[in-house]
Design a protein with these regions (language model features):
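General small-molecule cofactor/ligand-binding pocket signal
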Residues: 334, 443, 485-489, 527, ...
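Short acidic loop-to-helix transition motifs that present clustered carboxylates
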Residues: 30, 340-342, 364, 491-494, ...
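Rossmann-like dinucleotide-binding cores of NAD(P)H-dependent redox enzymes
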Residues: 444-479, 558-606
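C-terminal structured "cap/appendage" subdomains that terminate the fold
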Residues: 346-358, 363, 475, 492-498, ...
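Flavin-dependent oxidoreductase catalytic cores
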Residues: 1-422, 426, 430-442, 450, ...
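N-terminal Rossmann-like NAD(P) cofactor-binding module of classical short-chain dehydrogenase/reductase
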Residues: 506
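Rossmann-like dinucleotide/flavin-binding elements
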Residues: 413-444, 487-501, 509-518, 522, ...
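Short, contiguous acidic/charged loop-to-helix segments that flank catalytic cores in large enzymes
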Residues: 303-309, 409-411, 416, 457-469, ...
């Protein structure tokens, strides 16, 4: 039996027969990487942010044609986007996969808000219909009171975002939206969905999670304080979602696949509410995609506190799937968040905890991971380090290149060389693997007895365990290649390299450390952060850490957990200012606040 038989088993979703149980989740635009995922086995590809006008999407069904007599007109920008989406769709379909996106409706706008009545671009507003020309104010500028509602979340205001993420309030009070605005949103979403189907999309998904979209704001008691037929009771709060899906099913047909994205248990609704909602949706939904709320360790930054629960979403999805089955509800359940291990994916499907698994980051780390799974080579899949920098993936930097450039990176060579790689950190290890795969004879030198370089210390704080997994993977890959020789505990001197008569050498020894001009820093009781990791057990009881970025904060946490009384000193006003706010709140602030021997001090003196 194939070790990943459940991942590779087909499944019927509406009128589609998916070849595997893995999908490519939302997060990428219509770029080259999406067809590459289809090439490597993804059954459904999400294409995000389809912002073209409904009339332009519908133009494919217009007998006059796009830009033809009686047809819709396109700007150069719209034409470029139109062609890019169409090309992406054609490639996905030609490779045997299906395409899915999210229909977009007319979002109600507050008075004074950008696009709203009296606001920039809105009716009667600057640059809007019947309004004056735009002045020098930024879009949406003006007193907060003009907009009404709960404005605590602002992605451009770090303090507001920190507060919102801390309190779990990522939406707005929707009491100001008129009945007309609600129906306009529903009807325009359905119209857009019909045109997306005509355009060539095989499946549609409606996002009803996270409190930052109108559907979840109506569903949540945190945002919905209305007293009319759209608020109050659970039935009234669900009215928008239920009405929308009923109209979508009628417009798209009984077999067209529809997905709803929900949080099983979140701010403003309980787990039992989610079960009830899915039951009410009935046959109007084919797939229930479960995501976590904002207060978790996966979204939008990915380190998890424990290796035992690599996906914080799995436990509640498992419970939901089995509870739905017990009630006789046979909607397919899709789970996402943190699935970067083929064995975990297989077990999740084999145990019946989910029917589908949506993946985003893993496609960046190893675009060929499903191909390796099909070949039974799960141990060769490149592990994702969950750094949340998918566009510049550190474990797969070649992904940013176009196909032609990527193809040239690993090519068989016409002349095999004897190559030395100096440095056993991640850069040197990866270089040795690439050289070996191209056919060269490689010798890797590392002056320490252990491979990994500076990443050997990166997982000292236990929530960064993915770093250790990546180093272990690199070492396994090196040892599997017969044309790689490891020289650990060996300093690669010029004399040694000359004596061995190497054709070429790659130097991967990392940067030099920069020391701050701080009085006392050269005394015996001072040391660099890497030295502090290595001699942590011999450091005195009281330790001061100079520098409060991620490195300084993590060594402080590490030493405090070892019993030292640590004070981290920073001149930046807060710890880890360079990290995404959710990562700071969940993995840094919550973490160090639970350690009584950890503290920090901010100061303004610069040296």
């Amino acid at each position: 039996m194939h070790p990943y038989s459940h991942i590779l088993s087909p499944i019927q979703v509406g009128n589609l027969l998916l070849p595997t149980r893995l999908t490519s989740s939302a997060g990428a635009h219509y770029s080259q990487e999406l067809p590459n995922r289809a090439l490597n086995g993804a059954s459904v590809i999400y294409i995000s942010h389809i912002m073209l006008k409904t009339s332009l999407l519908a133009s494919v069904a217009n007998p006059n044609g796009v830009d033809g007599p009686g047809g819709p007109r396109m700007s150069d920008k719209e034409r470029k986007e139109f062609d890019a989406i169409l090309t992406c769709l054609e490639k996905i379909h030609n490779l045997g996969a299906y395409a899915i996106t999210m229909p977009m409706g007319n979002m109600p706008r507050r008075p004074g808000e950008h696009g709203g009545p009296g606001g920039p671009g809105g009716p009667g507003g600057p640059d809007g219909p019947g309004g004056p020309p735009m002045d020098n104010r930024a879009p949406g500028a003006g007193p907060e009171s003009e907009g009404g509602g709960d404005m605590r979340y602002d992605p451009n205001d770090p303090e507001k975002q920190l507060y919102a993420e801390r309190e779990g309030v990522m939406g707005h009070d929707i009491g100001w939206i008129s009945e007309e605005g609600i129906w306009d949103y529903i009807n325009s979403t359905v119209e857009n969905a019909v045109n997306l189907k005509l355009f060539g999309f095989d499946m549609l998904s409606v996002h009803c999670a996270y409190h930052n979209n109108i559907a979840d704001e109506f569903w949540s008691t945190k945002c919905n304080h209305r007293t009319d037929a759209w608020g109050g009771s659970r039935k009234n709060r669900a009215r928008l979602i239920l009405t929308l899906f009923e109209k979508l099913r009628t417009a798209l047909g009984p077999d067209y696949p529809l997905e709803i994205i929900l949080t099983a248990e979140g701010i403003g609704h309980k787990y039992e509410d989610t079960l009830w909602l899915i039951e009410q949706l009935g046959s109007n939904v084919d797939v229930v995609h479960i995501r976590t709320d904002y207060k978790d360790t996966q979204h939008p930054i990915g380190y998890t506190v424990t290796r035992e629960m690599p996906s914080p979403n799995l436990e509640i999805t498992r419970r939901l799937k089995h509870d739905l089955m017990a009630r006789g509800i046979h909607a397919l359940v899709q789970v996402s968040a943190g699935f970067c291990n083929p064995d975990l994916m297989e077990k999740t499907l084999a145990d019946g905890d989910a029917d589908l698994i949506a993946i985003h980051r893993f496609w960046h780390a190893d675009p060929e991971f499903l191909k390796k799974i099909q070949e039974g080579r799960g141990e060769d899949v490149v592990p994702c380090v969950k750094c949340n920098r998918c566009g510049k993936c550190p474990v797969n930097p070649a992904e940013v290149f176009d196909d032609a450039t990527r193809a040239r990176i690993i090519q068989p060579v016409t002349r095999k060389k004897k190559v030395a790689v100096v440095g056993g950190g991640p850069g040197g290890m990866y270089a040795a693997i690439l050289l070996a795969d191209r056919g060269h004879q490689v010798a890797l030198y590392e002056q320490k007895e252990k491979l990994g370089g500076q990443l050997c210390h990166a997982d000292m704080v236990d929530f960064k365990w993915p770093m250790a997994d990546y180093i272990a993977w690199l070492e396994r890959q090196l040892r599997k290649r017969e044309n790689v020789t490891l020289h650990l505990g060996t300093r690669a001197t010029p004399e040694l390299l000359t004596q061995e008569q190497y054709d070429d050498a790659i130097i991967a020894i990392g940067p030099r450390f920069r020391s701050l001009n701080i009085p006392g820093l050269t005394e015996e009781n001072s040391c660099h952060v890497l030295e502090a990791y290595e001699r942590a057990d011999t450091l005195p009881e009281h330790v001061a850490v100079i520098g409060g970025s991620e490195t300084g904060t993590e060594i402080g946490i590490y030493l405090a957990k070892k019993g030292r009384k640590v004070n981290v000193m920073t001149r930046q006003g807060m710890l880890c200012p360079e990290t995404p706010h959710s990562h700071y709140v969940i993995m840094i602030m919550d973490y160090f606040k639970s350690i009584p021997t950890f503290s920090y001090t901010t100061f303004v003196q610069q040296y």
